[in-house]
Design a protein with these regions (language model features):
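Flexible beta-alpha connector loops of hexameric P-loop NTPases
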Residues: 74-80, 118-123, 130-136, 155-160, ...
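Long, contiguous hydrophobic alpha-helical segments, chiefly transmembrane helices and signal peptides
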Residues: 89, 95-98, 102, 136, ...
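Conserved G1/Walker A P-loop phosphate-binding module
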Residues: 1-120, 126, 133, 144-145, ...
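C-terminal-of-GTPase-core extension/linker across diverse P-loop GTPases
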Residues: 2-6, 11, 17, 145, ...
């Protein structure tokens, strides 16, 4: 999974990226300090995997990972090439979802840049969201118009392309009204057509509402955050309250116990990174299954609804091709049997599942196959 972290200059985007990846990307109070996208790979915390590693003491423990990409700052007019716009838009196109960092704090020492890098403008989270949305929408409109032209020409020789042209014409009108592709009302057939266009404003989005420490401590009463949350609810997006500077402080603590105590002192149950990962999984409809043994204990990420052979294919295409069965027990069931697969097997909880089995979150699976 690849998440693109975007935002206008000076909203805390690179600070957040530095914190969640410990990558040390340059963070400065001027536009475009992130010109090439910085990439960081982050392990997905999973207590189930930790427990299996404790039980089996494998040669290798491999968590699922998320790739975060810190994408260059954007200004108004990017879809026409302003700022670093073209590079920004292409980098977004390569991601699975967008984490849009939105400034929800006041600080006269940090410029708020929208259109002019030399102009300090008032903090306006909803306006910032609108600025980036508009650039994505304009880039999408250009793409959709090309698809209309292509489908119209193709329809002269094959009438099946008429439907494609109709759908894209309706979408073009929607985009032209300043609305994102995410909010385009369509049925499953139309959705399948729309998804072939690889549209930027169709990508799932998480709004990371970045606050200072004072604002984050009582974020439910932060007026900026309230506005972002209401917008997210309207468009079916996720919103995550976060303090990037605080996350940076947490990331600098190497000792897990120190981190836990620091979070406890702040009255925070989970770090922003953990909450962002959970948010990403929920947004994209992802789950994890586990493989286990003396050689390796590993977590694998799949889409909800994935059947056993396709889950096996995440490990190796040969296992999918020669799939026979999946010997399965859910982690929670195994723990209810004293943390013993053997005890669970004696109770008949170890199941032999076939090709139609839909893998569940936390399933521990041993795949039988023959090629």
């Amino acid at each position: 999974m690849k998440l693109g972290i975007v935002g206008l200059p000076n909203v805390g985007k690179s600070t957040l990226f530095n914190a969640i990846t410990n990558a040390g990307a340059e963070s400065a109070n001027y536009p475009f300090c992130t010109i090439e996208p910085n990439v960081g790979v982050v392990a997905v915390p999973d207590a189930r995997l930790d427990k299996l590693a404790e039980m089996y003491k494998p040669d290798k423990k491999t968590p699922a990972v998320i790739e975060f990409v810190d994408i260059a700052g954007l200004v108004k007019g990017a879809s026409k090439g302003a700022g670093l716009g073209n590079k920004f838009l292409e980098n977004i196109r390569r991601t699975d979802a967008i984490v849009h960092v939105v400034r929800c704090f006041d600080d006269e020492n940090i410029m708020h840049v929208v259109a002019d890098a030399s102009q300090n403008e008032p903090v306006d989270p909803l306006g910032d969201i609108g600025t980036i949305d508009l650039e994505l929408i304009m880039a999408d409109l250009e793409m959709v118009n090309r698809r209309i032209e292509k489908a119209t020409k193709a329809a002269k020789g094959d009438k099946k392309f008429l439907r494609e042209a109709e759908v894209f014409e309706a979408l073009a009108a929607h985009l032209d009204a300043g609305k994102s592709a995410r909010t385009f009302a369509c049925d499953d057939e139309e959705r399948a057509i729309v998804e072939t266009a690889d549209l930027l404003s169709l990508k799932p989005i998480i709004y990371a509402a970045n606050m200072d420490e004072a604002g984050f401590a009582d974020y439910t009463h932060n007026a900026y955050f309230q506005g972002v949350r209401e917008l997210a609810e309207q468009e079916g997006a996720q919103v995550l309250p976060i303090c990037a500077k605080l996350e940076q402080d947490i990331a600098e603590l190497d000792d897990p116990e120190e981190r836990a105590m620091f979070l406890q002192d702040l009255g925070i149950e989970k770090s922003g990174l953990d909450r962002l990962i959970q948010c990403s999984y929920d947004l994209l409809g992802l789950i994890s299954f586990l493989t286990y043994g003396k050689d390796e204990c590993r977590a694998w990420t799949i889409k909800k609804g994935t059947k056993a052979p396709q889950a096996a294919g995440k490990i190796h295409s040969d296992i999918e091709r020669g799939f026979i069965r999946a010997e399965t027990i859910n982690f929670d069931e195994m723990m209810a049997c004293g943390g013993s697969v053997a005890a669970a097997k004696e109770k008949g909880l170890l199941r032999s599942e076939g090709k139609e089995y839909v893998v569940k979150d936390g399933d521990m699976i041993y795949f039988r196959f023959n090629v």
